[in-house]
Amino acid sequence: MMSYLKQPPYTVNGLSLTTSGMDLLHPSVGYPATPRKQRRERTTFTRAQLDVLEALFAKTRYPDIFMREEVALKINLPESRVQVWFKNRRAKCRQQQQQQQNGGQNKVRPAKKKSSPAREASSESGASGQFTPPSSTSVPAISTTTAPVSIWSPASISPLSDPLSTSSSCMQRSYPMTYTQASGYSQGYAGSTSYFGGMDCGSYLTPMHHQLTGPGSTLSPMSSNAVTSHLNQSPASLPTQGYGASGLGFNSTADCLDYKDQASSWKLNFNADCLDYKDQTSSWKFQVL
């Protein structure tokens, strides 16, 4: 194809054709005309023309073709210019109305904002009125809850000790005795980690069994007989055997007495079913059936 386009002009019946092959093949594409974009000139209206147009616009916003032609003859302008002017004038009028409505809403909105706190205050007052009865009813509830709290005050401990004397009064009497003896013992042997060294386990397991057979048994005989007999031993009678970290275990369903020291701890848990004694080096277990 390119060779056909590049070849020199050829003759047809002895007449030389000087036109190119592209023109012969596509005569309409040979010299395309560049279309010029029509530029609409801006129309400037005089004061007299504007007065005539405004007068007609005051009468009607949508004039018909006859009215537009009549006005166009008066102001010496084409009818199309008059039509465009009315179109723009209607758009301008709508824009002004929207601005006025928005401005009116902006002026009314602050009034609504001013009235809204009053509504909120009224709603809050109504809400507070609704919530005041629960608050008044909750005061007796708080007073009733303060009553159990007052049980732990020193003034009310003494009257409550009588109904609890059957089971817990013996425990209360055993607190100071066991703690004072243990504190004195720990002062003498704070550095060592062994407690109750050199004691015979069978010497206190049998009386403990008789003392702990009943659920309401007291701790004062045990603490006065068994614990004091072994705590009052001389330091020379403490061999290398240690019963420190594991301590004495007496499981009880009622209460638990815990005494913790920096070096070691011993725990008394009272149970009438099982008596366990554990050592650090060897695990011993004594169960009284």
From Swiss-Prot:
It is found in: Nucleus. Residues 95-106, 118-129 have a biased composition (Low complexity). Residues 38-97 bind DNA. Residues 130-142 have a biased composition (Polar residues). It comes from Danio rerio (Zebrafish). Residues 93-142 are annotated as: Disordered. Its main location: nucleus. May play a role in very early embryogenesis, gastrulation, and the development and subdivision of the diencephalon and the midbrain. GO terms for cellular component: nucleus. Gene3D superfamilies: Homeodomain-like. Belongs to the paired homeobox family. Bicoid subfamily. This is Homeobox protein OTX2. Keywords: Developmental protein, DNA-binding, Homeobox, Nucleus. One of its GO terms (molecular function) is DNA-binding transcription factor activity, RNA polymerase II-specific. GO terms for biological process: cellular response to alcohol; cerebellum development; hindbrain development; midbrain development; midbrain-hindbrain boundary development; regulation of transcription by RNA polymerase II; retinal pigment epithelium development.
